[in-house]
Curated annotation (Swiss-Prot):
The gene is ycjF. Pfam families: DUF697 (PF05128). InterPro entries: DUF697 (IPR021147), UPF0283 (IPR006507). HAMAP family: UPF0283 (MF_01085). It comes from the Bacteria. It is a multi-pass membrane protein. It is found in: Cell inner membrane. The keyword Translocase does not apply. GO terms for cellular component: plasma membrane. The lineage of its organism: Bacteria, Pseudomonadati, Pseudomonadota, Gammaproteobacteria, Enterobacterales. This is UPF0283 membrane protein YcjF. It comes from Escherichia fergusonii (strain ATCC 35469 / DSM 13698 / CCUG 18766 / IAM 14443 / JCM 21226 / LMG 7866 / NBRC 102419 / NCTC 12128 / CDC 0568-73). Belongs to the UPF0283 family. Keywords: Cell inner membrane, Cell membrane, Membrane, Transmembrane, Transmembrane helix.
């Protein structure tokens, strides 16, 4: 059956019409008002790692102080005096035919020569580490250049320094992707997207493994002194592996330049307190309730180890970061928390068995 039609309904008031926003009248500013006009600036929120990155940069940046110049000048003068005195002793021993003294002078000359050779080798390694910063500047210039002819030679030099063989699949894909009509910016960009991620992936794995080992070891270690020694040893090994991965051989002085960052990494007590305070936001209620003090310290040590690895990766990397390819601390944080969660969940299971 069909329903009967409803009666008509008459409304007293008019229908409401949607009022579209109207544009304001045009305003013209005179010269006085234009001088007093200033655009509003939004306060950008500080980055999560900005303050700590500034501290790391300050720790790595060598300070050219007057005392350092005086010490270097004194050492140079002392070395020149030792060499001059040795030459004089050698001449006197030769004239007087004092063969014992002449043999001692020869032994001293060999020792001094070995010391000079070591200093030259260390200086060369330190120069190589500083040269990597110049290579990043050169790569940054090429990424903003519209010229041609320099990008391919530069990328081939980087591949040779990193020990990438010519038959490597990533390098072969890069050779197949470039052609003569491309400029330097396009050639370097292709290298950054095809070849450089091979080394970056290996560096990320090294950082993730070292951070996980630091987290788990600190969480189960009962001695604070052992914790500090373990962190220092693991971080030094991490620096060496990352530098070797990017084709840089670290010497004593170049390693000392990064050792200050390791000292910052040892002092992880403050970060551990922060991890305990914000643990409720990172994990579930159950896991945060079971998170012990040692486990929180382990997470803090792992996060700072990951930060150290990211900074060492940035210093040893020949190319600047492009787009979003820079590793984030949050990625390693999620991995550490996941591994710690699995460890805490496996512990009660083993006890029950």
């Amino acid at each position: 059956m069909t329903e009967p039609l409803k009666p008509r309904i008459d409304f007293d008031g008019p229908l409401e019409v949607d009022q579209s926003p109207k544009f304001k009248a045009q305003q013209t500013f005179d010269e006085n008002q234009a001088q007093n006009f200033a655009p509003a600036t939004l306060d950008e929120a500080p980055e999560e790692e900005g303050q700590v990155e500034a501290v790391m940069d300050a720790a790595l940046r060598p300070k050219r102080s007057l005392w350092r110049k005086m010490v270097m000048g004194g050492l140079a003068l002392f070395g020149a005096s030792v060499v001059g005195q040795g030459v004089q002793w050698t001449m006197n021993a030769w004239q007087t035919q004092d063969w014992v003294a002449l043999g001692g002078c020869a032994a001293g000359a060999l020792i001094i020569g070995a010391g000079v050779g070591s200093v030259v080798t260390e200086w060369r390694r330190l120069w190589r580490l500083r040269q990597r910063a110049h290579e990043r500047d050169e790569a940054r210039d090429l990424l903003h250049s519209h010229g041609a002819g320099k990008g391919r030679a530069f990328c081939e030099k980087l591949a040779q320094q990193a020990g990438i063989d010519q038959s490597h699949p990533a390098l072969q894909r890069w050779y197949a992707s470039i052609h003569e009509t491309q400029n330097d910016r396009e050639v370097v960009t292709l290298y950054a997207h095809l070849v450089q991620p091979v080394l970056d992936a290996q560096a990320r794995r090294e950082i993730s493994r070292s951070a996980a080992e630091s987290t788990l070891m600190i969480a189960v270690s009962p001695l604070a002194l052992v914790d500090m020694a373990f962190i220092a040893w693991r971080n030094l090994r991490l620096i060496n592996r990352i530098a070797t991965l990017y084709g840089i051989e670290l010497g004593y002085y170049s390693r000392l330049r990064l050792f200050r960052l390791v000292l910052l990494n040892i002092a992880f007590a403050g970060a551990s307190e922060l991890v305990r305070e914000v643990g409720m936001d990172w994990m579930s209620q159950d896991l945060a309730a079971r998170l012990s003090t040692r486990a929180a310290q382990g997470i803090g040590a792992g996060l700072l180890t990951a930060r150290l690895g990211i900074k060492a990766m940035e210093l040893c990397r020949p190319l600047p970061w492009l787009d979003d390819d820079k590793p984030r601390l949050g990625d390693f944080r999620r991995q550490l928390i996941g591994q710690l969660k699995e460890t805490l969940q496996k512990a009660p299971t083993r006890r029950e068995n």
